[in-house]
Amino acid sequence: MTTRIDIRFAQLKREGRPAFVTFVMAGDPDLATSLQLLKALPTAGADIIEIGMPFTDPMADGPAIQAAGLRALHGGTTLHKTLELVGDFRKDDATTPVVLMGYYNPIYIYGVDAFLADAKAAGVDGLIIVDLPPEEDAELCLPAMKAGLNFIRLATPTTDEKRLPAVLANTSGFVYYVSITGITGSASADSVAVGDAVARIKRHTDLPVCVGFGIRTPEGARAIAAQADGAVVGSALIDALQKTLDTDNRATQATVGAVADLVASLAAGVRGAQQAAE
């Protein structure tokens, strides 16, 4: 199968530049603002969009993304409404890849077959499910692949040579390398260590490797993108959004623009990695 993710990475390879991947939480702080933000991301420079599925117990997420998920849940965002959000985004954008990221529990409750059918129909291209290891591939990974969705696996600094082949076995779309040990937003990525890790992963796979966790500035994005096939930014965008909210955590006129401006500056940093390599 060829997905929008595959097409986008092939395009980026022809252009000789890394991908800029943005993460936002579905329904944060409300569904209408969330849709406006999604529509603004590609124009600002996002090559791939990851959309968080709000969940009550997000164990891998730091304070910023946890708070975003709670705002979304309090605003009434459900997994069904998250898929509707993707469908609404697709009415105006048929090309930007969309990856849903989150935890297995809401999908299990929704029903795997129903979720995969509805996700595919909405225009979802891939899934990142952080609490499903390769040993559980039969639960969701293999059915997702059969449904035509990429299943993107996480590799970490603690994923050793013995474990890596299992992690990569049924991965498609790209590999998401978590550059730090710990929760999101908790530290800065070390570009030298990242370069070594990406090289190690690439000895085992031809898939693109994108690096996330710990990227907050254009300079940081540029340094990481120079070592990988893409850079992922989430917590910094969530922080920028949160700073524009009113005292009741409602969106203001500044909300979408503030995030889009940061995306544009980070995207320029990622594109600077291409120029530095030339």
Curated annotation (Swiss-Prot):
Query: What is this protein called in UniProt?
Result: Tryptophan synthase alpha chain
Cellular component terms, GO, for this chain's entry? cytosol
Q: Does the keyword section mention Signal? A: no
Reactions the enzyme catalyzes: (1S,2R)-1-C-(indol-3-yl)glycerol 3-phosphate + L-serine = D-glyceraldehyde 3-phosphate + L-tryptophan + H2O
Hey, which pathway is this one from? Amino-acid biosynthesis; L-tryptophan biosynthesis; L-tryptophan from chorismate: step 5/5
One Pfam annotation reads Trp_syntA
InterPro entries membership: Aldolase_TIM (IPR013785), RibuloseP-bd_barrel (IPR011060), Trp_synthase_alpha_AS (IPR018204), Trp_synthase_suA (IPR002028)
Lineage per the UniProt record: Bacteria, Pseudomonadati, Pseudomonadota, Alphaproteobacteria, Hyphomicrobiales
Residues forming the catalytic site: 50 (proton acceptor), 61 (proton acceptor)
Please name the NCBIfam families in this protein's record: trpA
Q: Which organism is it from?
A: Rhodopseudomonas palustris (strain HaA2)
This enzyme's EC code(s): 4.2.1.20
What's the name of its gene?
A: trpA
Its annotated function is as follows: The alpha subunit is responsible for the aldol cleavage of indoleglycerol phosphate to indole and glyceraldehyde 3-phosphate.
Describe the family membership recorded for this protein in Swiss-Prot or TrEMBL.
Belongs to the TrpA family.
